[in-house]
Swiss-Prot record:
Function field: Essential for the encapsidation of DNA into immature virions (IV) and the subsequent maturation of IV into mature virions (MV).
This protein's UniProt keywords: Late protein, Membrane, Transmembrane, Transmembrane helix, Virion
Domain of life: Viruses
Keyword Transmembrane helix belongs to the record: yes
Topology term for the membrane: Single-pass membrane protein
Species of provenance: Variola virus (isolate Human/India/Ind3/1967) (VARV)
Induction: Expressed in the late phase of the viral replicative cycle.
Protein name (record): Virion membrane protein OPG139
Post-translational modification comment from the UniProt entry: Phosphorylated by a OPG054-independent mechanism.
Length: 68
């Protein structure tokens, strides 16, 4: 009996979550943001992370190149 109630509760929760997601999708598509296609401005932290990625890739390249 408890297992059936638990299963019904899970089904109801999943159904409500799907309906809520569909509602938000429809609501957001009716009022699109004017800056949807613009990339976010590059911040100082983003530049730092991008530089770290470049350094990491170049060091990996040098490691592979030296091991061959």
């Amino acid at each position: 009996m408890i297992g059936i109630l638990l299963l019904i509760g899970i089904c109801v929760a999943v159904t409500v979550a799907i309906l809520y997601a569909m509602y938000n999708k429809i609501k957001n598509s009716q009022n699109p943001s004017p800056n949807v296609n613009l990339p976010p401005p590059e911040t100082r932290n983003t530049r730092f992370v991008n530089n770290l990625e470049k350094d990491h890739i170049s060091s990996l390249y040098n490691l592979v190149k030296s091991s061959v």
